[in-house]
Regions:
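Catalytic loop of short-chain dehydrogenase/reductase
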Residues: 136-164, 170, 174-177
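Conserved glycine-rich Rossmann-like NAD(P)H-binding loop of the short-chain dehydrogenase/reductase
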Residues: 30-45
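Active-site loop of short-chain dehydrogenase/reductase
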Residues: 6, 82-84, 98, 129-143, ...
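Substrate-binding pocket helix/loop in short-chain dehydrogenase/reductase
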Residues: 98-99, 103-111
Length: 246
C-alpha cells in the first residue's frame, strides 16, 4: 500500500513524536491533520510542514483529557478530513516520580488522556474510517504498557494508563477483524526528541545510543505502508542495549 495521498490524523502532533511523524508524513506526500491541546505548538509544526512542502496542514485543538474537546475535534475532523484513512493515537500526558507524590489532578490527566480520551476519539472516528476501502488505527503504546517491562522513570499512573491502552488495542483488534480497518500498535522505549527539520535527524547512531524519534517514526510508517493483506499487529522497538528488560 502506498502512503502517498493518504489522509492521516495524528494526536499529540504539537511536539515530540507526534510532531516528527506529522512532518515525516508530509515528506511522504501524505495529508496530515494535526491534533493537540497546545495551539501554539500545532501552528509551529504546521508552519514547518508548509515551509518544507508548500502545503499547510489543518490543525484541530483536541485535549484528550477533556471529552467535550474530543467531541468538538471529531466534529471539525468530519468537515476537514472526510476522507480520513489513518488515525495515529500518539497523544498522551506523561508524569514521572513517586506514586505518593502524584496529585489527583495529575493522575486524572494521565488516565483520561491516555485511556478515556483515546478510546472516545477512536470510537467517534470509526464511522469515517469505515467508509474507506482500507484504513488504519495505529496507537503508540510505549513499552511501559507491557507487563514484563520495567518502569525506568515512568510513574505508576502512566504505567497503569499504558497497560489499559494496550488492552484497548488488543480488544479493538479482535472486534474489527474482518473489517476494512487494520489495528496496529508500537511499543517504543525511551526516545530522544528530534524533528526531521533538525540536523541531528540524519545522524547515524551506534549500538549504545538511545532511540530517536526518527527510529520510531520510520517504524510506524513501515507498519502503515504494508500491503492490504498484511497486518503487523504489534511491534516492540527498543535500543539494542536495552534498559527496559534488564
Amino acid at each position: 500500500m502506498t502512503l502517498s495521498g493518504k489522509t492521516i490524523a495524528i494526536t499529540g502532533a504539537g511536539r515530540g513524536l507526534g510532531a516528527a511523524l506529522a512532518i515525516a508524513a508530509a515528506d511522504r506526500h501524505m495529508k496530515p491533520v494535526l491534533l493537540g491541546r497546545n495551539e501554539r505548538g500545532l501552528l509551529e509544526i504546521a508552519g514547518l510542514i508548509e515551509a518544507r512542502s508548500g502545503r499547510r496542514p489543518d490543525c484541530v485543538i483536541c485535549d484528550l483529557a477533556d471529552l467535550a474537546s474530543v467531541a468538538s475535534a471529531v466534529a471539525k475532523l468530519a468537515i476537514l478530513a472526510p476522507d480520513l484513512d489513518i488515525l495515529v493515537n500518539s497523544g498522551s500526558q506523561w508524569t514521572g516520580g513517586a506514586f505518593e507524590a502524584q496529585t489527583d489532578e495529575q493522575i486524572a490527566s494521565v488516565i483520561n488522556s491516555t485511556v478515556s480520551g483515546t478510546i472516545a476519539l477512536t470510537r467517534r472516528l470509526l464511522p469515517l474510517l469505515s467508509t474507506r476501502p482500507a484504513a488504519d488505527i495505529h496507537t503508540v503504546v510505549s513499552m511501559s504498557g507491557l507487563p514484563y517491562a520495567r518502569m525506568r522513570g515512568s510513574s505508576v499512573p502512566f504505567v497503569a494508563a499504558k497497560a489499559a491502552q494496550n488492552g484497548f488495542v488488543q480488544a479493538l483488534t479482535e472486534e474489527l477483524i474482518g473489517s476494512p480497518i487494520r489495528v496496529t500498535s508500537i511499543h517504543p522505549g525511551i526516545i530522544e526528541d528530534v524533528l526531521p527539520t533538525d540536523d541531528t535527524w540524519n545522524e547515524e547512531r551506534n549500538a549504545s545510543d538511545m532511540l530517536s524519534d526518527r527510529n520510531v517514526v520510520e517504524a510506524i510508517l513501515y507498519i502503515l505502508d504494508q500491503p492490504a493483506n498484511v497486518a503487523i499487529r504489534s511491534l516492540v522497538i527498543e535500543r539494542a542495549r536495552t534498559e527496559f528488560l534488564s
